[in-house]
Amino acid sequence: MTFGEKLLNAASTRGRLCVGIDPHESLLTSWGLPVNVDGLAEFSRACVEAFADTVALVKPQVAFYERFGSAGFAILEETIQTLRERGCLVVSDAKRGDIGSTMAGYASAWLDPASPLSSDAVTVSPYLGFHSLDPVFELAEQHGRGVFVLAATSNPEARELQDQQNADGVSISQQIVDQAAALNAPYMAQGKAGNIGVVIGATLSKPPRLSTLGGAILMPGVGAQGGTASDVDEIAGDMAHLAFPNVSRSILATGPDIAEMKNSVAKNAADFPGFPRS
């Protein structure tokens, strides 16, 4: 089964919300936790308890674990494994991007079932060229895992690069979406969602066209950054059933109380229901 189909199945019962696990320093402090490995472990444990049975897609931000070295990665491994064991799909927000054997190494780290960091999906950067990511696409195809390619992100700095156009007037972000769509096309022809998704900001005034993507859309920018449910639907258009808005800040702000975080998840998820599956 493709990652896209797994995600649609999960969303049919849990909704289309993606919740981030972002244990940055100020949040650890606001939770009354020490800014060290112990604080990281407790933060992650609370997030697992709050999200594992309620959310379709959870997105740990790898950088906040990586900063603590091997001990941080050990906590990330446990977090990913526990979430997946309890029925969540996990996208590791690593934003990796390289070429050749190095990219293959990143692919194995995040998508190979034998890896201790094995996730359902991973975020990647296409800056070195879309097909520099072929090793991760190939492993995703082999194991039914997902890849989210950065396409049109919500940070203002992105516009100077992602909005640049080629000689035919097609923006870089649109080219990325179109190339992802080409990889998903065989599945879309069968009425299925493919393995290759894109990252599209929910606050964009001129987003790329997504009507032929045929894969999942990870949409940061909802909530604290100003994006709304109507923005998500408008940008995603015909692919709205595959749009998964990422909400992190407002939900994590209700921690460390697990019940409060669950309540916040329920309130946010109500705006993004899943669709019944036959």
UniProtKB/Swiss-Prot annotation:
Per UniProt, the keywords (alphabetical) are: Decarboxylase, Lyase, Pyrimidine biosynthesis
Where on the tree of life does the source sit, at the highest rank? Bacteria
Matching SMART domains, A to Z?
OMPdecase
Any single GO molecular-function term of the entry would be: orotidine-5'-phosphate decarboxylase activity
This enzyme's EC code(s):
4.1.1.23
Q: Which reaction is this enzyme known to catalyze?
A: orotidine 5'-phosphate + H(+) = UMP + CO2
Tell me which InterPro entries the record gives. Answer: Aldolase_TIM, OMPdecase_AS, OMPdecase_type-2, OMPdeCOase_dom, RibuloseP-bd_barrel
Enzyme's top EC category: lyase
- Put simply, this protein is called Orotidine 5'-phosphate decarboxylase
Q: What is the lineage of its organism?
A: Bacteria, Bacillati, Actinomycetota, Actinomycetes, Mycobacteriales
Whichever gene encodes this chain, its name is pyrF
